[in-house]
Structures are given as structure tokens and as C-alpha cells.
């Protein structure tokens, strides 16, 4: 089994750019940014429980990494960068720390490196279980209306929230819930030590209005790019700013 993805081919000899979306997104999420790099071959992946991979269920990060590895092999991708937002960034960091043959580097936008104590994990598990229950039992429009009121999305205006609620409500609530719990921060290890000892290139992107993840970025041994005029979802709020940072990283 492999993950559903959309592949766009560029010039031979350059590494692939493999894009991983955030929770409730899909393979289209990164395309406005990714298509600015047409010289590179691009793979836009649907993570388990999302988009064309909605029917694929996993028990945890190990399963996701295994699926990602098999997907890369199926496309004969031998040399690549992982580019991930939020959940996709956490998947990218986990997979990279576990080892991926052919990995050039990891570019993470607003991805959490992991909670650092049992109390934080227990609280996160309670929270994610409550959200998962709502995703399973309530209309998605109602759930996402509350989801985007969370502090991490404080930089969004009302119109942006409404647009995201409509977009995300096309998902399957049950499969979102399953993926939310399977890849919860409550079950993700703290990756700070692994990332410090890494053998791959590591870059971190965060919006200038995303105070939480700017603080987290400062804890990581990573080259950090702050995206102007953007909050947590920087590639949606300021795609040109993210394109500029990726171009600098890739020396496009």
C-alpha cells in the first residue's frame, strides 16, 4: 500500500520536492508554492485519513513513515527534500530522524518538535480525544468553526476563518479523528535531541505573527526563516514569502 499523491516532473538531475500538508489539508495545499519550482520534480502527498488517502488508517508515526517510504520508492524518488507544514512537518521530522535513504534535507513550517513532559502529553491526549470525538459525531462546519478559534490561529481574520471552515469541511470526520489520535503530539517523542544530532540539512519556517512557533524554533538547531505578514499557516497567508525562503534554501 502507498499513499495517494500527485507527481509533477521537472528537469532531470535535481532532487525532488516532497510536500506534506497539515491536518485536514490535502495534496493541493502546497501547490501554489510548489509550482513556483517547476525545475524540480514535485510530489504532493495525501497523508493517511486525508484526500485520496482517506481510506488508509495508521496506528502511529511508524506506520506513516513506512507508507511514506514505500510511496517514495514507488515513484522511484532517490534524492529529495521533505517540505512539511504543521502535521506534515511533524511527519517529516519523525521520518527523517528514523532515516530515509536519499534525503537531502527537511524544511518544516510550523511543526512541533515534541512535548517535553508527561503532564503536557496527558493534557494534549485529553484535548485531542475531545476533538476526535467531535470530528466523529458533529457537523464538520461546526467543529472547524471552533477549531480555527484556537490561539495558534489568532492571526486569521473572520473572512479567512470562514474560507478555511468551508474548505476543511469537505473532509471525512471519522478518518480525520483517527489520524488526529494516531499522530497526536501526545504520542510523538520529543525530537530536539535527534534533530540536534541530525546528519541532514534542517530548515524551519514560521510566520512572524506565530509567537508560539517562533519560540519553538528558537529551541531547535535549525536555520530559521521568519515569514513576514503571516501567522501559523504561512504558506497560505503569504505564499510569496514562503517561496522566497524556499528559493534561498534551495539556491533556486
Swiss-Prot record:
GO terms for biological process: menaquinone biosynthetic process. SUPFAM superfamilies: alpha/beta-Hydrolases. The gene is menH. This is 2-succinyl-6-hydroxy-2,4-cyclohexadiene-1-carboxylate synthase. It comes from the Bacteria. Keywords: Lyase, Menaquinone biosynthesis. The keyword Lyase applies. It is an enzyme of class 4 (lyase). Monomer. Its EC number is 4.2.99.20. Pathway: Quinol/quinone metabolism; 1,4-dihydroxy-2-naphthoate biosynthesis; 1,4-dihydroxy-2-naphthoate from chorismate: step 3/7; Quinol/quinone metabolism; menaquinone biosynthesis. GO terms for molecular function: 2-succinyl-6-hydroxy-2,4-cyclohexadiene-1-carboxylate synthase activity. InterPro entries: AB_hydrolase_1, AB_hydrolase_fold, SHCHC_synthase_MenH. Catalyzes a proton abstraction reaction that results in 2,5-elimination of pyruvate from 2-succinyl-5-enolpyruvyl-6-hydroxy-3-cyclohexene-1-carboxylate (SEPHCHC) and the formation of 2-succinyl-6-hydroxy-2,4-cyclohexadiene-1-carboxylate (SHCHC). Transmembrane segments: none annotated. It comes from Escherichia coli O9:H4 (strain HS).
